A protein has these predicted regions:
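Domain-level signal for soluble alpha/beta catalytic cores
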Residues: 1-793
């Protein structure tokens, strides 16, 4: 597929609407009630040039099917059969089509990760049993949900698995995922092809296809919409010929699997086939670099990247106590302190007597990913603990570490391979600590060779050349540095060292550690594991990055040291850290506003209780809670914070509100409420993720939200408004077919004697459409808050 084009079909929903699909009707049930219609549509696409048709199974999940009389297996098997019937006499193949579950996964939502995996697995099992030729996971906006679906597909079938996600005009998904994070995560998890579908037309998505082709070795899929929809009539603005012309550039960028999504039909696929079938996809200009990520934070390992060492119980009594007590908030504070000090990766070690590492490591990983947005390096040799943690990690992590023993290689490398993790290879084996650089290099070569046999690319192998204590083995410092030099410069690998080991047992450890770090970076150390809370250590890294050409125009160096105020702040912070390093490392959040902004629920609740000793409840809302939420909202608008941060802050604010409510109740006072709002997803539309996010954010600004749910008739909205004397209504629609329902709801509300203000939003709603209806346009949850402030105060 890298060398020839493969043609997919176009939209199924568009064709079903053309054939009279009724508002609110579940399209997947047509596989049972009208399979000939589906077969006819599939056949039209095949006649237009389609080689792979997507079965009508996009929403055939347990959550949706529970409202019907049919099982997932009933619907999937019927849909696959209808598609296969269309392929008779042709070489076309049938893909099991899997869409999102319609509910946010934890921690942004309430759906547990393993429940999502199980729901997807049920679909996969049904598709395999029905004879699907491949699996296409599509229209994902949450990388975590895409991972759940991909794991289910890989664990329950041997079929090829393709995954496409939907990116908006910001170049990110709805949840903030970047192109590189998507590519490296899904590639590592074993996807056979990846790409983009839906959301925009080929012209708008072209820069994203170009970016994707630069960061993946996999075949790339393009299934864009027919331009952008007109919210008035639902028609898309790009005719077939123009769609096809734009797709020529998409193929030229390196895309090799092409089709269409919303608004496209067989005419589009025919025009596309005519325009590009003789083309050879452009070559991928791929940079094969080392890479770790979270969904919203891609981190290329180019130059020195600091790994924070403090999440480790060794020699840390308070940390040991926290592990034994399950005090994860303390561990989060340690993490935040390191990230604030400049750590770009966090090493995570929870191994301690009395601690169930298999249970604790994934708990800590989930908690850390809620609080900090840097990649994690999972520090354990327990294969079961690593598997449990890697399974719930969102993004591409690293495993620390695998040594040269054959047993360790055979046990740990398969786990890293399954979950797409990078591997730290420790240069020792069953013979013990090697004394020479040459011996360490030989072990490194064996580790790389073993990793490649398991399918782990060499750029995902980082070598730890061993830092030994110079006070006991002085000659070994030079051997370590020589090994680092060879591994990095001759083998071209990233190198790791636990730098502080060098100074154990010596006075003025900081000076020795700093000096060794500088020497090691000069020899090729790229991933130092250090304490970022030590100012002098981070100062050395900042200076080295300038001298090594990593800090362009000395920008980061100047920002760090460029003003007397900054220097004074650094001195004050350093004094605090050095006076009590263990305690201060965990005292990262002492400000209520900061706790809300960071989404730290426990800290926010604790600090709110403390603040009530000197402030009243209303003051907490007006001086702390609202300004903190406004700050996150502004960052969200600017594109420096994303949905996880927005929802995390809302959840922390919710914890503060609970404290305020309890305090008022104890005094016999009334709850703090700023006005009541009715929200609903309109009749015929079953999508409510966006509406639920709006509800959460509004509630945490102090508004009382009456959520009528999804698929809500206009009369129900009107009745609630009249009964509750509502002054503001929020309506959501995701599909163009449900816009008439939105219009009718607005019309009925406007006929009331004292009509409420109305705000509307959703993927298909535009500012012009909202203005035409005489409503406010709420592009997102943040905008809904601003509208509520205008209307209700």
């Amino acid at each position: 597929m890298e060398h020839k084009l493969t043609f997919l079909d176009g939209a199924m929903g568009t064709m079903l609407q053309r054939h009279g699909l009724k508002l609110g009707e579940i399209p997947e049930l047509l596989a049972i009630t009208n399979p000939d219609l589906l077969t006819n549509i599939h056949r039209q696409y095949i006649e237009a040039g389609t080689e792979i048709v997507y079965a009508n199974t996009f929403g055939a999940n347990r959550r949706k099917m529970q409202k019907t009389h049919y099982t997932v297996a009933d619907v999937v098997s019927a849909a696959i059969a209808a598609a296969k019937k269309a392929c008779i006499g042709t070489s076309a193949r049938v893909a099991l089509d899997i869409g999102p579950l319609g509910e946010l996964l934890e921690p942004m939502g309430t759906l547990p990760f393993e429940t999502a995996v199980d729901m997807f697995a049920e679909i996969v099992d049904a598709g395999v049993n029905a004879g699907a030729d491949l699996i296409c996971i599509e229209t994902m906006t949450d990388l975590y949900e895409a991972k759940a679906a991909l794991l289910a597909a890989k664990e329950h079938s041997t079929l090829p698995v393709w995954v496409t996600m939907s990116f908006d005009a910001t170049g990110r998904t709805f949840t903030g995922c970047t192109i590189p994070s998507m590519a490296r995560t899904l590639e590592g998890l074993g996807a056979d092809a990846i790409g983009l579908n839906c959301s925009q037309g080929p012209k708008q998505l072209l820069p994203l296809f170009q970016e994707l082709c630069r960061v993946t070795t996999l075949p790339v899929i393009a299934k864009p919409n027919a331009g952008l929809p007109d919210p008035v009539d639902g028609h898309y603005d790009l005719p077939p010929e123009e769609f096809a012309r734009t797709m020529v550039d998409v193929v030229g960028a390196g895309v090799s699997i092409v089709g269409g999504c919303c608004g496209t039909n067989p005419d589009y696929i025919r025009a596309l086939h005519d325009a590009v079938h003789t083309m050879t996809p452009g070559a991928h200009d791929i940079h094969h670099g080392s890479f770790l990520c979270t969904p919203t934070m891609p981190l290329e390992i180019s130059g020195v990247r600091v790994i924070g060492e403090r999440i480790n119980p060794t020699g840390k009594k308070r940390f040991q106590q926290a592990l034994l007590a399950g005090d994860l908030d303390y561990i989060v504070d340690v993490a935040i302190a390191q990230v604030d000090a400049g750590a770009q990766i966090l090493d995570v070690n929870v191994g301690y007597p009395g601690v169930d590492e298999v249970a604790m490591l994934p708990r800590v990983v989930r908690k850390l990913q809620e609080a900090v947005d840097v990649p994690l390096q999972l520090d354990s040799t327990n294969a079961a603990a690593l598997e449990a943690a890697l399974r719930v990690y969102n993004g591409k992590a690293a495993v620390n570490s695998v040594n040269g023993e054959e047993k360790a290689l055979q046990t740990l490398l398969p786990v890293a391979k399954k979950y797409g993790a990078a591997v730290v290879g420790l240069a020792l084996d069953e013979k013990g600590l090697p004394k020479t650089a040459a011996e360490r290099v030989e072990i490194a070569k064996r580790i790389v060779a073993a990793a490649e046999r398991f399918g782990i690319p060499r750029e995902d192998v980082f070598i730890d050349c061993l830092t030994l204590t110079v006070s006991a083995q002085q000659d070994q410092a030079e051997e370590t540095l020589a090994a680092v030099r060879t591994v990095h410069r001759d083998m071209g690998l990233q190198t790791v060292l636990g730098v502080s080991n060098i100074s154990f047992g010596l006075p003025n450890r900081l000076l020795m550690t700093q000096t060794f770090l500088i020497r090691a970076m000069n020899e090729g150390l790229t991933l130092p594991i250090i304490n970022p809370n030590q100012k002098e250590i981070m100062d050395a890294v900042a200076a080295f990055r300038v001298l090594n050409g990593e800090d362009e125009a000395c920008a980061a160096y100047v920002e760090r040291f460029g003003s007397e105020a900054a220097l004074a702040a650094e001195k004050q912070r350093a004094a605090a850290v050095s006076s009590a390093p263990t305690a201060k490392a965990a005292a990262a959040v002492t400000n209520l506003d900061d706790a809300i902004i960071r989404g730290l629920k426990a800290d926010a609740a604790r600090l709110a209780k403390e603040a009530l000793a000197t402030e009243n409840e209303l003051s907490l809302v007006e001086k702390h809670l609202i300004p903190a939420l406004d700050k996150v909202g502004t960052d969200y608008e600017r594109g420096v914070a994303f949905l996880p941060q927005l929802l995390g802050a809302a959840q922390a604010a919710q914890a503060v509100f609970s404290v305020i409510r309890d305090s008022l109740a104890a005094k016999g006072g009334e709850p703090v409420k700023k006005g009541r709002i009715v929200i609903a997803t309109v009749k015929g539309d079953i999508h409510d993720i966006g509406k639920n996010i709006v509800r959460t954010v509004l509630e945490n600004y102090g508004y009382d939200v009456l959520d009528l749910g999804r698929d809500v008739p206009p009369e129900t909205v009107v009745d609630a408004v009249v009964k509750e004397n509502i002054r503001l209504v929020g309506l959501s629609a995701l599909m163009t077919t449900t816009l008439p329902s939105m219009e009718e709801t607005v019309r009925q509300l406007h006929t009331l004697p004292n009509p409420p203000s109305i705000m509307v939003g959703g993927a298909v709603v535009t500012p012009e459409y909202a203005q035409k209806m005489g409503t406010f346009y709420a592009k997102d949850a943040r905008a809904s808050v601003e509208i509520a402030k205008k209307v209700l105060g």
